[in-house]
Amino acid sequence: FINLEEDKLHTEVPKILGSCKDGVIVPHPGPFTFTATRVPVSDGHTASITLGLEKTPDLDQVKELIEGYRGRAQELSLPQALEQPLVYRPEIDRPQPLLDRDRDNKMAVSIGRVRPADAFENGMGIIAVGHNHGRGTYGNAVLITELLVKEGLVG
């Protein structure tokens, strides 16, 4: 159990998936559900994600989208930005925190077990693993700083 972690997810994920209008974050309406658990792994977060989509997903296309994803950090060639921040793992037993969390200097997120999900009409499930410090707190702080400098928002 991680005290307040699930509450934090219910607050933060809709903001992350939302939009910005007139300088104000408009949270995505969801629906969302989260469970946070503590496991005996020193580093690495695992997310089991199930989505309901507007139409039946083409899983091969989803895999291509994962492999081809490039964000603003890649567009601007920020110094600490990976060329490929998301890595698709085709193995049936991957990703796993102990095996995948340190990928690409702890900055990559490994995604696998892309599959249909019956929980929703047009459902899809994935498993994602990232390093909670390298890709999380420390790595994101560095990327955000690089972005602010590159965009001329700080000197």
What are these regions (language model features)?
Residues 1-123:
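C-terminal substrate-binding/catalytic lobe of Rossmann-fold NAD(P)-dependent oxidoreductases
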Residues 103-155:
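NAD(P)-dependent Rossmann-like dehydrogenase/reductase catalytic/cofactor-binding core
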